[in-house]
């Protein structure tokens, strides 16, 4: 599609900003107590000058002091290039292999959905409440999610699918120039395969197209065949992949 993966990564980092983050010798350390690992992990994207082992030690101390596991998000843009191997030597294991996929906003697909499901455009607080209800999130994760979205510098468009007044699926989109990113796609187990997620993606793509965002990206675990099947309908293809590394007892 001719889309620069580095630009997608930049837009994704912009959308997942948190009030609790700092730079350390070119690494972006995010320290949110929320559910999203992208907002509570080390993102090593910039040049580095300090000895690598000492930097990792410092990260472990900082995350430990914050009551968080030390997670490293390893992308094709990670620096130094031997970081992944260095973490493996220290006993860090790789997990949550994630596909970053991209499609054009014109890739619409009107699908059939349960007639009892209705889509609603909602504000940030209502959206976060719906996500928390669908995930069964504890209050600390719900509050961190609200903090992150409420203070985002990017415009957000959120949709909740409801049946009998209850949320059954949701998804939101953040805008960054010619890019729009889809996040927080969640569907209640009893409603999977009934068209709710497809309808939300279709509506989000329509909104992106109307707003002039030509390219839409999302991130999905490679072991989620149901979600991959939905995204495939809209022509999403993988631009690059990333994974996390953590101690075996902290892979969460």
Predicted feature descriptions by range:
Residues 66-76, 208-219:
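Conserved GNAT acetyl-CoA-binding A-motif
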Residues 21-25, 76, 82-93, 155-171:
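Conserved beta-hairpin
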Residues 52-60, 184-189, 193-210, 229-233:
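Conserved acetyl-CoA-binding loop-helix of GNAT-fold acetyltransferases
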Residues 50-125, 245-246:
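Acyl-donor-binding surface of acyltransferase catalytic domains
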Residues 74-81, 218-228, 245-251:
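Conserved beta-strand-loop-alpha-helix junction that forms the acyl-donor binding cleft
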Residues 144-186:
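A conserved beta-strand-loop-helix scaffold within acyl/acetyltransferase catalytic domains
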Residues 1-7, 98-100, 107-145, 162, ...:
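Short amphipathic alpha-helix that is part of the acyltransferase structural core
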Residues 1-65, 79, 140:
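N-terminal charged segments
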């Amino acid at each position: 599609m001719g889309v620069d993966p580095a630009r997608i990564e930049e837009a994704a980092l912009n959308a997942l900003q948190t009030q609790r983050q700092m730079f350390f010798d070119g690494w972006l350390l995010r320290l949110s107590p929320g559910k999203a690992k992208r907002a509570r992990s080390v993102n090593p994207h910039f040049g580095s000058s300090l000895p690598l082992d000492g930097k990792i030690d410092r990260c472990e101390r900082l995350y430990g002091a914050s009551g968080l596991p030390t997670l490293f998000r390893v992308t094709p843009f990670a620096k130094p290039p031997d970081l992944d191997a260095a973490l493996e030597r220290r006993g860090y294991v790789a997990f949550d292999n994630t596909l970053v996929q991209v499609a054009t906003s014109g890739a619409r697909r009107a699908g059939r959905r349960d007639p009892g499901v209705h889509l609603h455009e909602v504000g940030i607080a209502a959206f976060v409440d719906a996500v928390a209800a669908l995930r069964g999130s504890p209050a600390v994760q719900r509050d961190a999610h609200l903090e992150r979205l409420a203070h985002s510098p990017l415009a957000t468009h959120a949709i909740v699918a409801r049946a009998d007044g209850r949320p059954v699926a949701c998804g939101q989109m953040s805008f960054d120039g010619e890019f729009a990113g889809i996040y927080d796609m969640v569907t209640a187990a009893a409603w999977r395969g009934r068209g709710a997620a497809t309808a939300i993606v279709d509506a989000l793509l329509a909104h992106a197209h109307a707003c002039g965002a030509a390219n839409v990206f999302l991130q999905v675990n490679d072991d989620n065949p149901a979600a991959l099947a939905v995204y495939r309908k809209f022509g999403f293809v993988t631009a690059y992949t990333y994974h996390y590394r953590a101690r075996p007892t902290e892979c969460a």
